[in-house]
């Protein structure tokens, strides 16, 4: 039996506690770490490749000022073409998407209108 086969056989017979102790002792003896290496970040690709900018956004109603609830409902109705009851339910539910798949400019315009009415809006 070769030395390597002998070592493999002995290591295979170790218990988990013994293997952990062996690992710790070898780290101390050799000055190395058994932890997984950290992945390096890939270098940036040449400047010819443009970074893809997000083109479609989703407008979310995060919260609203209680005093301006009616204004927010009116604005939601005008944006979504919902009826009064549906718009009220949507506003009261919070954290709901008001519009999806809108352009950046349209999303920012909707955000301005809703914030002027007293809502807190996020774009995703």
UniProtKB/Swiss-Prot annotation:
Function of the protein: Forms part of the ribosomal stalk which helps the ribosome interact with GTP-bound translation factors. Is thus essential for accurate translation.
Family: Belongs to the bacterial ribosomal protein bL12 family.
Keywords: Ribonucleoprotein, Ribosomal protein
CDD domains, per database record: Ribosomal_L7_L12
Quaternary data: Homodimer. Part of the ribosomal stalk of the 50S ribosomal subunit. Forms a multimeric L10(L12)X complex, where L10 forms an elongated spine to which 2 to 4 L12 dimers bind in a sequential fashion. Binds GTP-bound translation factors.
Keyword DNA-binding part of the UniProt annotation: no
GO biological process, one term: translation
Keyword DNA repair carried by entry: no
Origin superkingdom: Bacteria
Protein name: Large ribosomal subunit protein bL12
GO CC terms in record: cytoplasm; ribonucleoprotein complex; ribosome
NCBIfam families the record matches: L12
InterPro entries per record: Ribosomal_bL12, Ribosomal_bL12_C, Ribosomal_bL12_C/ClpS-like, Ribosomal_bL12_oligo, Ribosomal_bL12_oligo_N_sf
HAMAP family: Ribosomal_bL12
Species this protein is from: Liberibacter africanus subsp. capensis
Pfam families reported for this sequence: Ribosomal_L12, Ribosomal_L12_N
GO molecular function, one term: mRNA binding
Gene3D superfamilies xrefs: 3.30.1390.10, Single helix bin (1.20.5.710)
């Amino acid at each position: 039996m070769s030395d390597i086969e002998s070592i493999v056989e002995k290591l295979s017979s170790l218990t988990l506690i013994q293997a952990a102790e062996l690992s710790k002792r070898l780290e101390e003896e050799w000055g190395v770490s058994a932890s997984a290496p950290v992945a390096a970040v890939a270098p940036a690709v040449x400047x010819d490749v443009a970074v893809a900018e997000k083109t479609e956004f989703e407008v979310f109603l995060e919260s609203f000022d209680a005093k301006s609830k009616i204004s927010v409902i009116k604005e939601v109705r005008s944006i979504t073409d919902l009826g009064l009851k549906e718009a009220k339910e949507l506003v009261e539910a919070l954290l709901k998407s008001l519009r999806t798949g809108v352009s950046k400019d349209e999303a920012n315009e909707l955000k301005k209108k809703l914030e002027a009415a007293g809502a807190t809006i996020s774009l995703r």
